Regions:
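Classical Sec-dependent N-terminal signal peptides that target proteins to the secretory pathway
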Residues: 1-20
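A generic structural signal for ordered secondary structure
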Residues: 3, 16-17, 32-34, 75-79, ...
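N-terminal helix-cap/turn-to-beta initiation motif at the start of protein domains
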Residues: 19-36, 61
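Short polar catalytic/cofactor-binding loops
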Residues: 36-43
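Beta-sheet ligand-binding and adhesion/scaffold domains
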Residues: 55, 89-146
Length: 146
């Protein structure tokens, strides 16, 4: 499956600009993802783990509100994904509460979905977290209208 890069929320918009050049492969562990800050929020795409290792972080939990958990000693905010749609140009994750996250353009990845990270107090090095790809595959899927 492929994933996209411009990250948008419906209530507040944060932009993560991806380089149009080829993105590092999931197995290339030497190249860290780019760190960006926008609107006092931190967004990070983490280094992928080796294909045969455990997922890097926690699976999203259920619940109506955005949830906090502690990872590597720091607070991180995770989104509650309920379903997703996909076109040739973007991937949309729908969140509880009506918000959605849109990624564009995306890269080939086979075991781990992205890796979104958002911390309101964005002045420090944020906490990493990932959404395992197997979890994404278990969500209701709809082919979006082109």
């Amino acid at each position: 499956m492929r994933l996209y890069f411009y990250l948008t929320l419906t209530l507040q918009t944060f932009t993560f600009g991806a380089n149009p050049h080829p993105v590092p492969k999931i197995t290339d562990l030497r190249k860290p993802w780019v760190f960006a800050r926008a609107n006092e929020a931190s967004l990070l795409f983490i280094e992928p783990q080796h294909k045969n290792s455990e997922p890097y972080a926690h699976i999203i939990q259920s619940g109506e509100k955005l949830q906090w958990f502690e990872f590597n000693g720091k607070d991180a905010l995770i989104w509650d994904v309920t379903r997703f749609t996909e076109t040739d140009k973007e991937l949309t994750l729908y969140l509880k509460g009506g918000n959605k996250v849109i990624f564009t353009p995306y890269w080939d990845i086979d075991h781990c979905l992205l890796i979104i990270r958002f911390t309101p107090e964005a002045s420090y090095n944020p906490t990493r977290f990932a959404i395992p790809y197997q979890y994404l595959k278990s969500l209701p899927y709809e082919k979006a209208e082109e």
